[in-house]
Amino acid sequence: VSTPTLSSPTRTGSAPRFQRPVSRPRLHIVPPELRISDGPAAGVLRVARSRGPLSRDVAAKATGLSIATVNRQVSALLDLGLLRERGDLTPSGAIGRPRVPFEVNHEPYLTVGIHIGAVVTSIIASDLRGKVLGAVEVPTPQGASADALTGIARSARAFASRWHRRRPLWAGVALGGRVDAQTGVVDHPRLGWKSAQVGAIIATGLGLPVSVAAHVEAMAASELLLSPDSEDGVAQGETGLYFYARETAGIAITIDGRVHTPSSGPGSIAHLPTGSSAQCSCGSRGCLEATISDRAVISAALDAGILPESNQRPTMSALYKAASSGSAPAHEILVERAQVLGKTVAMLRDLFNPDRVILGGQAFTEYPAGIPHVAEAFAQASSLERRDIRISGFGNRVQEYASTVVSLSTIYSDPVGAMRRTSS
């Protein structure tokens, strides 16, 4: 049974009802643009998102573009329906359209984000500002990838149809495993998927252009494109390390406003040694995921008698609740996890020496009492001067914003080209 996690849909705007997908001459599987684009149309749309409503002269100052260039881009984006003018906000005595403020025309449209987790799949509807309109969680279907993805697409289509006045523009899928962004094909060992046609099946099921990305890379992109902190931009040459931990662990690197996306797919930190005695499926002991994943922590809690045996496997929520309610053994097992995470982040930070480090995922955000232990272990293990290290501002919603940014990244990077794809 699906469980809504955010606010109920806002029924605004004037776009046509989301209908059963019509036949298309070809599928649009488009690699995501996990970067801050320097194109003029992208720059104008970005400043409209962050500062709108605003005038053209303010937009020119904010983007560094000439007034003439801003006028051309605003006119093009107005014609495409991505911007709207606010004549009601025109200063008294102002003459001519250049004085009329403009903003993102967010009410007629939505995008569909899908985060496919090992256990739960989240489906998210967002507007063009990157604001989440609503979200729903469904169990990730088990079995053959084609059947599972068809079911996910069906659920996503039904969910998006709740906003009957909004026109869906794009779908974005974020998930673990090895992702070929060009083709939308994914290998996901945890789900048993080999050459899963993620892009093709979701595009067919929704009748929309679709982009597919590795989920940790997408989380890093959400910090660049959707975080309030991103409004000030990224310093030239600035580097970042994004570290994620929950059921899996992973990292992504950002360089100069762009997520580094290796052509052969993201690397893995699953088997980094931690020194623990946890048995890994690879045959070794002490591998990172075998030590800190939700599944590993629950198993350790069961072995220690912290959580009761039952017909249904306990959840992390039960462990967090026990620790928050004063269970010293539950707290201790979460502290041990926090210490391993802190040491691992320190090792990676010393290796890459980025300008900033962002920690994301429920392993950090679900148990705030563990954060001081992450920080202490990090400080003890790192040999470099401390810089900007923080927890993601998206909190427990990092998965939602990861898929949201995949659904929006191409529109943000090339608004004109993206809108042409949506109408072809």
Language-model-derived ranges and their functions:
Residues 236-291:
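Glycine-rich phosphate-binding loop of actin/hexokinase-like ATP-binding domains
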Residues 132-239, 369-379:
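Glycine-rich phosphate-binding loop and adjoining helix at the ATP-binding site
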Residues 127, 181, 254:
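Short, acidic, Ser/Thr-enriched surface-loop or helix-capping motifs
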Residues 175, 245-247, 294, 361-362:
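Short secondary-structure boundary segments
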Residues 1-89, 93-153, 157-158, 228-235, ...:
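ATP-binding/phosphotransfer module of carbohydrate and carboxylate kinases, centering on a glycine-rich
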Residues 88, 137, 191, 264-265:
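Short clusters of small/polar residues that mark proteolytic maturation junctions
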Residues 101, 111-115, 168-172, 240-244, ...:
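Short glycine-aspartate micro-motif
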